[in-house]
């Protein structure tokens, strides 16, 4: 019996499960029948299915409909509650819609409605009505008959006033009036009792709020962004249920005294206003969690800001704040702290207590304590630094980095020797050794020391010169006044001004004229005045260019996004407000990042030492100037200084991490405190330590002089010198000599070298195979070369391992298909679409960028074929082409483009091919914080036609999702030409906007 019972129970359970599964399937089927989405196929007329009686949600959006399908009105007797008609082409609300009396939700946004008729009153059961992004100027009085209406969205229209009957909407909770043409705050809203959320942003002529706003007691969320508000009425303080208040992009400079009464406020945005003082009433908002005060004129934060203990988000970027109160470290819940673009030099002690901060932005501040390099690494590094400072005796050691640069034969090396070896004038020799480093104790009594970098003028070294540019250095631009002529100002001076500006914002530059013993007095005066004048002209021209760009962005921001998105001729077609604001911020940053050029031109002679003493005194004076070089007067932990000095002693090329850690122990640094110290020494250019590289993180390259000697070997481009190094071994026979000639020729023409030849070239500098491997790994990390047949294992079956240095490639064109060279796609390939992303550099193209980019992309591509200015390769089976077009005067900027192609259905493969390359290029460009460049996506249709000037779509679109419901874009080069949206927008946003630095 027991067995039968068990069997019966089991059968009952199985039967119950079958019935349950059937019920679930039936419920799911009914659910799918309740929601129906219909789409047009090939622009045919939309036809409704026969039986829609059970359908509750009908979506006819994104169909470009001008009229609704037949039979829609017959659904009035059914269960239809939600009708979606968004993104069509309706000029009026279709009559059939007004007969659907059971509707509770109607979405007819993104159409072309110019009016809403009084028949809207027939939709008496509506709870949600969306009419945004149309062309409505008025709303009918009958809107007041919709007594069940809870949500109304009429944003992005042209409404100038609201009907009086609006106050008859007792259930209305959410009202969106964003971006209309309302000139005053509608008093009808005072009598909408249930209103909780109101968006009034973008009604630009508001100016002020009426006192009667106090009656809106139910408000929880209020948006008043970009409404030209100059003053808030006291009555706003009576909206005691407010939780979020947006007041950004106005002209406010104070808040009402009673503002602290808004005790339920959780979020306040007053960014982009005119506050000069921190509003005292805010200090009473002890439960405030988010405060945005970016882009104001704040100078000081109050000490009692610590009473705002619940703050999680605090944005204070782009103000004029000089210091932070010590009490800010008590804001223990802070997770976002944005302070970039201020004048903060010192962070409070115990700043590391803000351990929850995960969004931290501090760049563009004159930080000296902790050092800028430490602050940029994050809160944990600041904590480690401050802890170290507390553990050890602080030490101050002024040691200024001096960078000499200029054209070949400008006199840099002789000038360095005159400055650093004043006692011995007989030893002066011209320098052709490449880049050289000299330590110069300028004044032992005053403790002033310099480390002098003499950057070679030969263009062969252009790829590595930027590695020696760093913040906090003094740049001496050396000009040969004998060879200087006015019409070549840009070559002698202007180019270097652009170079330093792009790499090092706010850099200090001293211009020194040499060879004055070869010039007469009148010639000197004229040339110095010309240099001074042309610098001013160039700086003014650049500033005016940037100012014009800012005005262009401002004009675009003054337009509705909907206008930009629908107007192909707009300068920023489809670009979001967020990206435009980011772009404007970047342009303003470029405007404020100009060089500090010490004038006038200092003229010297290295032959008779004329004015050398005066130049020395000038350099010492500048070095001691706290406002010019505050970093020289920062306090560092003595243990960090000792660690630096201990690393100078070993003569080896590199140290293992453990060797370095043992030196750290001598300096009093335990292993856990070592990482921060090494990171600082790397960021400040004292040694190289790559903690982000799997191989190199185990080593410390402390001997920079030897490393520079190694770099000089590769970049001097002198065949006789290279050949001499290879044949220095007396045992070299005639066969070997011939091979050496072949290798040198291959290197100088194609950039190719095998490892055994590299080892021979570096023989004086490296001793072991490990030395060689680490140097090659380091050169790859720096983007100077790549291995073309790197073995996956340690052995390559006896084959020779080759390295390629792209900067040496001289052949003009790689072997590639015809379309790469600009010829039209042949007839069978007309279905192929081309993707091309173009980077343009109007002021200056970073030297060596194309060669370094060529190295960085090597891990992403196969079957590559390189020329001097072009790379043809594959990513998987998809072709990619990287091209560089050097600048040709002011009217033809340098251009770097990344291209691929595929058929339209497979265009995602082309995006997949170029996206990693775009990301690598963006990463390299981050090294040039003040570089002005643009990014565009070129029109595929124009490229297919062979147009010499294809239309450029804004590169910002790469960082935006594809617009909802949009399948085609218009090319303004030909108004009737349409291209698929997938040819401009990637499948998902793939890159940071070019102005996000």
From Swiss-Prot:
Localization, UniProt: Cytoplasm
UniProt cross-references to Gene3D superfamilies, sorted A to Z: P-loop containing nucleotide triphosphate hydrolases, Ribonuclease Inhibitor, ROC domain from the Parkinson's disease-associated leucine-rich repeat kinase 2, Winged helix-like DNA-binding domain superfamily/Winged helix DNA-binding domain
Q: Which GO terms describe its molecular function?
A: GTP binding
Q: Which domain of life is it from?
A: Eukaryota
Keyword set includes Cytoplasm:
yes
The alphabetized UniProt keywords are: Cytoplasm, GTP-binding, Immunity, Inflammatory response, Innate immunity, Leucine-rich repeat, Nucleotide-binding, Repeat
Ranges where the Roc domain occurs: 393-626
First and last residues of every LRR repeat: 32-53, 54-76, 79-100, 102-123, 125-146, 148-170, 171-192, 194-216, 218-239, 241-262, 264-286, 287-308, 310-331, 333-354
State the InterPro entries in the record: Leu-rich_rpt, Leu-rich_rpt_typical-subtyp, LRR_dom_sf, LRR_domain-containing, P-loop_NTPase, ROC, WH-like_DNA-bd_sf
Task: Mention one GO biological process in which this protein takes part, according to its record.
Answer: regulation of signal transduction
Per UniProt, residues of the COR domain are 637-861
A GO CC term assigned to this protein in UniProt: cytoplasm
> What does this protein's UniProt record list under function?
Probable GTP-binding protein. Functions in innate immunity and more specifically the inflammatory response as a regulator of the Toll-like receptor TLR2 and TLR4 signaling pathways.
Q: What is this protein called?
A: Malignant fibrous histiocytoma-amplified sequence 1 homolog
**Top-down, what is the taxonomic lineage of the species of origin?**
Eukaryota, Metazoa, Chordata, Craniata, Vertebrata
Which gene is this protein's source?
A: mfhas1
């Amino acid at each position: 019996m027991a067995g039968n019972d068990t069997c019966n129970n089991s059968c009952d359970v199985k039967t119950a499960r079958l019935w349950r599964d059937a019920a679930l399937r039936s419920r799911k089927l009914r659910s799918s029948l309740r929601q129906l989405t219909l789409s047009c196929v090939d622009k045919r007329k939309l036809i409704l299915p026969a039986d829609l009686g059970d359908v509750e949600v009908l979506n006819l959006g994104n169909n470009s409909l001008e009229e609704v399908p037949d039979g829609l009105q017959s659904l009035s007797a059914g269960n239809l509650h939600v009708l979606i008609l968004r993104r069509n082409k309706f000029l009026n609300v279709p009559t059939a819609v007004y007969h659907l009396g059971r509707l509770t939700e109607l979405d007819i946004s993104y159409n072309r409605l110019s009016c809403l008729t009084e028949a809207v009153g027939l939709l008496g059961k509506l709870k949600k009505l969306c009419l945004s992004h149309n062309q409505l100027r008025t709303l009918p009085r009958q809107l007041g008959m919709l007594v069940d209406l809870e949500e109304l969205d009429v944003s992005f229209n042209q409404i100038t006033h609201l009907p009086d009957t609006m106050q008859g909407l007792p259930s209305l909770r959410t009202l969106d009036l964003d971006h209309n043409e309302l000139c005053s705050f509608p008093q009808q809203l005072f009598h909408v009792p249930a209103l909780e959320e109101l968006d009034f942003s973008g009604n630009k002529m508001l100016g002020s709020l009426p006192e009667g706003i106090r009656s809106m007691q139910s408000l929880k969320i209020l948006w008043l962004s970009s409404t030209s508000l100059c003053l808030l009425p006291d009555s706003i303080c009576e909206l005691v249920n407010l939780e979020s208040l947006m007041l950004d992009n106005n002209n406010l400079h104070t808040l009402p005294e009673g503002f602290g009464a808004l005790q339920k406020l959780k979020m306040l945005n007053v960014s982009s206003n005119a506050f000069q003082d921190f509003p005292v009433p805010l200090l009473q908002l002890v439960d405030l969690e988010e405060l945005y005060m970016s882009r104001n004129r704040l100078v000081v934060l109050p000490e009692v800001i610590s009473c705002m203990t619940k703050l999680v988000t605090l944005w204070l970027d782009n103000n004029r704040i000089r210091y932070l109160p010590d009490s800010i470290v008590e804001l223990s819940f802070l997770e976002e702290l944005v302070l970039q673009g201020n004048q903060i030099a010192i962070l409070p002690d115990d700043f590391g207590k803000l351990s929850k901060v995960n969004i931290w932005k501090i760049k563009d501040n004159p930080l000296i304590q902790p050092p800028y390099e430490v602050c940029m690494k994050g809160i944990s590094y600041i904590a480690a630094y401050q802890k170290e400072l507390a553990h050890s005796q602080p030490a101050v050691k002024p040691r200024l980095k001096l960078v000499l640069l200029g054209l070949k034969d400008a006199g840099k090396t002789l000038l360095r020797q005159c400055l650093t070896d004043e006692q011995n004038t007989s030893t002066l020799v011209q320098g052709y050794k490449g880049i050289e480093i000299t330590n110069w104790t300028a004044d032992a009594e005053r403790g002033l020391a310099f480390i002098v970098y003499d950057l070679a003028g030969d263009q062969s070294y252009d790829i590595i010169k930027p590695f020696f540019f760093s913040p906090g250095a003094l740049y001496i631009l050396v000009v040969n006044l004998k060879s200087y002529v006015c019409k070549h100002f840009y070559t002698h001076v202007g180019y270097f001004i652009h170079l330093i500006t792009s790499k090092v914002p706010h850099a200090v530059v001293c211009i020194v004229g040499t060879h004055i013993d070869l010039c007469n007095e009148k010639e000197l005066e004229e040339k110095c005045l010309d240099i001074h004048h042309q610098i001013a002209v160039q700086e003014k021209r650049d500033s005016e260019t940037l100012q014009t760009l800012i005005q262009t962005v401002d004009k675009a921001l003054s337009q509705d996004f909907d206008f930009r998105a629908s107007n192909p001729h707009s300068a920023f077609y489809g670009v979001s407000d967020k990206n435009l604001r980011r772009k404007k911020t970047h342009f303003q940053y470029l405007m404020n990042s100009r060089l500090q050029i010490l004038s006038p031109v200092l003229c010297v002679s290295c032959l008779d030492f004329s004015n050398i003493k005066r130049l020395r005194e000038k350099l010492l004076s500048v070095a001691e100037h706290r406002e010019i070089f505050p970093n020289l007067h920062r306090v560092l932990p003595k243990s960090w200084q000792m660690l630096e000095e201990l690393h100078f002693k070993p003569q080896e090329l590199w140290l293992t991490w453990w060797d370095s850690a043992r030196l750290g122990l001598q300096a009093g640094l335990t292993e856990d405190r070592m990482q921060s110290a090494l990171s600082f020494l790397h960021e400040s250019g004292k040694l190289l330590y790559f903690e982000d590289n799997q191989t190199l993180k185990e080593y410390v390259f402390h001997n920079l002089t030897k490393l520079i000697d190694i770099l000089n070997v590769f970049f001097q481009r002198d065949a006789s010198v290279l050949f001499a190094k290879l044949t220095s071994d007396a045992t070299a026979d005639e066969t070997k000599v011939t091979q050496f000639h072949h290798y040198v020729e291959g290197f100088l023409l194609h950039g190719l070298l095998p490892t055994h030849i590299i080892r021979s070239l570096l023989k004086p500098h490296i001793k072991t195979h490990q030395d060689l491997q680490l140097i090659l790994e380091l050169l790859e990390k720096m983007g100077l070369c790549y291995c073309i047949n790197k073995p996956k294992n340690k052995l390559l079956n006896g084959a020779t391992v080759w390295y390629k240095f792209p900067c040496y490639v001289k052949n003009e064109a790689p072997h590639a298909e015809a379309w790469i060279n600009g010829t039209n796609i042949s007839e069978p390939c007309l279905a192929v679409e081309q993707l091309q992303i173009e980077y343009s550099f109007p002021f200056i193209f970073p030297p060596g960028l194309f060669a370094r980019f060529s190295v960085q992309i090597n891990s992403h591509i196969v079957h590559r074929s390189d020329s001097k200015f072009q790379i043809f390769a594959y990513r998987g089976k998809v072709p990619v082409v990287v091209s560089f077009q050097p600048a040709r005067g002011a009217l033809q900027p340098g251009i770097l483009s990344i291209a691929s192609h595929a058929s339209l259905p497979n265009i995602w493969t082309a995006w997949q091919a170029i996206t990693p390359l775009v990301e690598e290029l963006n990463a390299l460009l981050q090294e040039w914080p003040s570089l002005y460049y643009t990014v565009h996506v070129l029109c595929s249709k124009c490229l297919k036609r062979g147009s010499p000037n294809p239309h450029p779509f804004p590169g910002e679109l790469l960082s935006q999702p594809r617009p909802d419901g949009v399948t085609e874009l218009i090319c303004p080069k030909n108004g009737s030409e349409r291209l698929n949206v997938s040819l401009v927008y990637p499948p998902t946003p793939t890159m940071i906007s070019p102005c996000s630095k």
